[in-house]
């Protein structure tokens, strides 16, 4: 274990960086404030939180069904609580242009979730794509699913359209544009008589079993022998809750393992002299990069926290503090083996 104490704090203050071999927990202290054969997939995945936490959706980056002629030469990933930005450089090593359909499938979101959930509508409104510095307007596709009695998922998009729901209404679990009760009433009237035949999980309250997945798509041509730059950005979907020390984060518990929370950080969070009582979580599906024919040529990860916060994540010794609030890691020939889970701890406002 290597400890790096900032020169302007004493031993009773927080360490600015704490990195262990193979895993790292980084934190700091400051002023409190609060895409024709092989599709390219920009993949996302959903993560569920405990009942007393706000659920969040862990979004991701490009996944490629291996085309031996196209390589990802570079990926720059920036993560903060306000924005996720990703920039890619793809090289077509063949003598012919290759056109792919690029997809960004979002996770499923249930129509029956409670209000304590991430800002999915905000994510939809913030999603932007550029190819070689030109804005891309993707097509939007929606699929709807129900859970069956045997625990499997049934694609019920066509059935719901027969019930009179439009694509826009099918997206409601994501966009929250329509009153849930009215959509639920429409589904109940249409589907309840068919529930047994459809083998839905329950014959009752069918309106609350529907979940929606949105998929963005666009055509992208990778010029022969050329490099294509693709960028996308969005507001991350955050979750969070309150800490009740000393019970959280429990030593060796799920939170400590998921975010590689060091003993120093755990003790700091449990110390009554400090007021780090709220936390924010986000996830990023990094392992999609492992689906490429070759490793990522050059990978850069930048994580930024707000002043006054602590941040912890699992990474190796390459993650370094480059400013009071920014941490960065650089890798060559990078093949990600696990996804990113990041947690930010914030100080309470004075009472």
Task: Report residues per predicted region.
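Single conserved hydrophobic/aromatic residue that forms the stacking wall/gate
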Residues: 1-13
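Short, Lys/Arg-enriched N-terminal segments with co-localized hydrophobic residues
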Residues: 10-13, 17-32
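Residue-level detector of alpha-helix boundary/anchor positions
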Residues: 25, 40-42
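Sec-dependent signal peptide recognition
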Residues: 34-40
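Lumenal/extracellular ectodomains and adaptor appendage modules
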Residues: 49-351
């Amino acid at each position: 274990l290597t400890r790096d104490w900032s020169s302007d704090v004493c031993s009773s203050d927080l360490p600015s960086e704490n990195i262990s071999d193979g895993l790292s927990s980084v934190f700091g202290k400051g002023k409190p404030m609060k895409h024709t054969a092989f599709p390219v997939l920009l993949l996302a995945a959903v993560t569920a939180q405990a009942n007393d936490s706000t659920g969040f959706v862990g979004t991701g980056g490009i996944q490629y069904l291996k085309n031996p002629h196209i390589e990802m030469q570079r990926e720059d990933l920036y993560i903060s609580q306000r924005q996720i930005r990703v920039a890619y450089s793809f090289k077509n090593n063949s003598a012919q242009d290759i056109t792919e359909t690029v997809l960004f499938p979002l996770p499923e979101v249930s129509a029956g979730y409670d209000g304590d959930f991430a800002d999915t509508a905000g994510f939809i409104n913030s999603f932007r794509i550029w190819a070689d510095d030109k804005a891309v307007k993707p097509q939007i596709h929606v699929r709807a699913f129900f859970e069956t009695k045997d625990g499997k998922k049934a694609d019920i998009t066509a059935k719901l359209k027969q019930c009179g729901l439009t694509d826009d209404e099918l997206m409601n679990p994501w966009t929250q544009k329509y009153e849930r009760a009215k959509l639920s009433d429409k589904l109940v009237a249409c589907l309840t008589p068919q529930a047994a035949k459809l083998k839905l999980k329950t014959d009752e309250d069918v309106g609350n079993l529907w979940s929606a997945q949105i998929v963005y798509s666009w055509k992208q041509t990778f010029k022969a022998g050329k490099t294509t730059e693709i960028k996308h950005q969005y507001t991350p979907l955050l979750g969070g809750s309150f800490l009740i020390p000393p019970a959280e984060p429990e030593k060796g518990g799920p939170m400590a393992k998921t975010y590689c929370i060091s003993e120093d950080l755990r003790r700091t969070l449990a110390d009554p002299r400090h007021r780090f009582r709220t936390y924010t979580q986000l996830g990023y599906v990094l392992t999609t990069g492992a689906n490429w024919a070759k490793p990522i040529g050059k990978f850069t990860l930048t994580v930024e926290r707000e002043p006054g916060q602590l941040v912890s994540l699992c990474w190796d010794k390459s993650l370094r503090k480059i400013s009071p609030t920014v941490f960065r890691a650089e890798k060559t020939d990078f093949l990600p083996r696990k996804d990113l889970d990041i947690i930010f701890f914030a100080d309470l406002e004075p009472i």
